[in-house]
């Protein structure tokens, strides 16, 4: 339990705005909220899509899911168009402004507001420009690649997961970019012993002696997951264990195929990762960071158009995960991962929750380069 950062008799209030599109934005928000709550802050969380008028938020969520399922290349084309055409980008920023009034009410009384979703950052930046929000706005960049929509004018700070992402954010004009450690739940850690890994395999009914490749595709089971499972199995280097998330149709189809081990929605992902030897992913989001925190090598393969491919490129540039771009590259990547696995380890970057806490309490020194745990403990000592 983290000691309180708040002096007795004071109240510090943090508002976090995410979005229920997949699980990555909400996952980061949830972990930030947990850390800040344990440090003594009052934390409110809001779904940006719920702040949009009428049923617009639900429509956006459904449209995005449909794009990824039925026409994934259209999502990539849209992201490229938003990058290249100012009028289209301006229209999307204006769309985010539809939530501004409710967002201003939701953030009232906060000492700092954190966004883990691009459109929320745009709406908060708009409020800052108009003087309707007078406290710092912090954007936590959930992806390793940074699209221009992430960067909002008048956002006070941007937290990037790696110098690669930080450099992209700076090129796009982001203010006060800082590198932080990923906001990953502490349960994601390497197995402490062979026995712990075997018990995890027993819990999920997994083969005890096989090399296991965990195939992840987000909460929606998006992408060409079936082909990935077949390709991993065909390599004869590992048995695929696929997590289908909430995609019931995918789970049923893979179960009928009889290839590998098929799972649906898994609550205890930390234990499942400790049961496996490597992770094959297609989006480059939170699951990749959780795998690295668990000491597992990660391979990007059959990546989703758009953010999946740009994240894969950034992960590869950072040295965190190779990208097998073609089926004939997968066996070599699997062999390398299984014979010389590399864990991400401690990055030495600041705890993002500590940065937010410092901004909320007026103790911000923009200090980086120290282990995240030391950063938080030093703030605790200073507050006491």
What do the PLM-derived regions correspond to, one by one?
Residues 131-191:
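Active-site-proximal region of nucleotide-activated glycan assembly enzymes
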Residues 110, 155, 276:
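An anion/phosphate-binding loop that grips the pyrophosphate of nucleotide cofactors and donors
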Residues 31-106:
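Conserved N-terminal ligand/cofactor-binding loop architecture of enzyme catalytic domains
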Residues 345-384:
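C-terminal alpha-helical cap of glycosyltransferases
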Residues 194-202, 206-276:
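Donor-nucleotide binding loops and adjacent catalytic segments primarily
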Residues 100-118:
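Short N-terminal targeting/anchoring amphipathic segment
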Residues 316-320, 325-341:
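C-terminal "capping" alpha-helix adjacent to the active site of nucleotide-linked donor transferases
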Residues 269-310:
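A donor-sugar binding/catalytic signature common to diverse glycosyltransferases
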């Amino acid at each position: 339990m983290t000691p309180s950062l708040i002096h007795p008799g004071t109240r510090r209030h943090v508002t976090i705005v995410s979005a229920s599109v997949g699980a990555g934005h909400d996952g980061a928000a949830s972990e930030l909220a947990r850390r800040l709550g344990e440090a003594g802050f009052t934390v409110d969380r809001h779904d940006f899509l719920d702040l949009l008028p009428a049923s617009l938020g639900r429509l956006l969520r459904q449209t995005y899911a449909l794009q990824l399922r039925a026409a994934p290349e259209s999502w990539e084309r849209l992201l490229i168009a938003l990058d290249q055409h100012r009028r289209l980008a301006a229209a999307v920023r204006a769309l985010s402004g539809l939530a501004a009034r409710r967002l201003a009410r939701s953030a009232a009384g906060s000492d700092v507001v954190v966004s883990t979703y691009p459109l929320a950052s745009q709406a908060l930046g708009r409020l800052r420009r108009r003087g309707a929000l007078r406290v710092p706005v912090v954007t936590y960049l959930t992806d390793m690649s940074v699209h221009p929509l992430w960067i909002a004018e008048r956002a006070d700070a941007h937290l990037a997961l790696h110098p690669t992402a930080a450099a992209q954010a700076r090129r796009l004009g982001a203010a006060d970019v800082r590198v932080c450690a990923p906001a990953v739940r502490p349960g994601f850690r390497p197995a402490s012993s062979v026995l712990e890994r075997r018990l995890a395999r027993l819990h999920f009914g997994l083969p005890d002696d096989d090399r296991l490749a965990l195939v992840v595709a987000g909460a929606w089971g998006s992408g060409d997951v079936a082909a990935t499972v077949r390709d991993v199995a065909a390599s004869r280097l590992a048995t695929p264990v696929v997590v289908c998330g909430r995609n019931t149709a995918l789970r049923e189809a893979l179960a009928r195929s009889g290839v590998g081990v098929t799972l649906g929605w898994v609550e205890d992902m930390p234990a499942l990762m400790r049961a496996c030897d490597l992770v094959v992913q297609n989006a480059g989001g939170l699951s990749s960071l959780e795998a690295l925190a668990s000491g597992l090598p990660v391979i990007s393969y059959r990546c989703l158009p758009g953010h999946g491919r740009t994240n894969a490129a950034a992960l590869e540039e950072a040295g965190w995960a190779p990208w097998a771009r073609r089926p004939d590259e997968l066996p070599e990547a699997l062999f390398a991962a299984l014979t010389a696995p590399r864990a991400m380890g401690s990055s030495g970057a600041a705890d993002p929750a500590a940065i937010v806490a410092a901004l909320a309490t007026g103790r911000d020194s923009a200090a980086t380069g120290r282990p995240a745990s030391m950063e938080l403990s030093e703030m605790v000592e200073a507050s006491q």
